[in-house]
Amino acid sequence: MAESTALLHSMTTWLAPWEFSPLWGLACLTAAIVYMRGARRLGRHHPAVGWSRPIAFLAGLALVYIVTQTHYDYLSQYMFFPHRAQHLVLHHAAPFLMALALPGAALAAGLPMRIARPSRRLRPLVDLLQHPLVAPLLFVGLIYFWLIPEVHFNAMLSQDLYQLMNWSMFIDGVLFWWLVLTPSGRLGHGRRILLLLAVVPPQILLGAYLTFSPTVLFDVYEVCGRAWPLAPLVDQQIGGLITWIPATMMSVIGTLIVLRQLRRDETRRQRMPPSRTPRDVIG
């Protein structure tokens, strides 16, 4: 009984915020409420809802909460490889799951009109950030930028810069994965696959560089002290592998999903009756 109580206390402590950020907590809670409100309005049998999509969307939000509002955030600030795993979640895994849910219809249905109308003013900015030439450059560029040793050093020592870094990664991840996984979006299947493949080589190069670098590139973790007694170079090598392999696999999985969407659309098109010409109607 005592062991169970101690385990429960340990889990509760770990799940409690390390440094509570009202903005992250409010964002996760608001997104969940708006989505579920919209899903309820549309109905469970609506094609935009179903049962798997809410699970994917809420799982993405849960991952965001875990890496930003639990004691995992402590590890992310005092070890390099947990930090890279945190950004893998914020920039890849969580936005991927949320975009996979195709939540546009549910979010639109759940958003109060007084908020929905002003939010349309952001459309030109979103269109710019999701431009086919801008989106992959921004997606890869942010990863490189925040891993410039001098920039990374300052970001890990400044609470404001640290939050800016995490928010920029998450927002850009949502914009990118929403663009490439939405079948009825602004891009066709081929262009979405090209974008997914375009971001792979730069991530491989960066991950390989971090993994095989003979020197420690990020000494901020020595200044602050590491959470675990792990050799600095080993910490960096594991972080490099996280930047390299899982991030690349996300693009591969995304490509397979788009190919599946393409096959489904072609099957649906073949099942449609041929369109009748005016001559057919007259005859």
Q: For each predicted feature, which ranges?
A:
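Alpha-helical membrane segments of multi-pass proteins
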Residues: 1-283
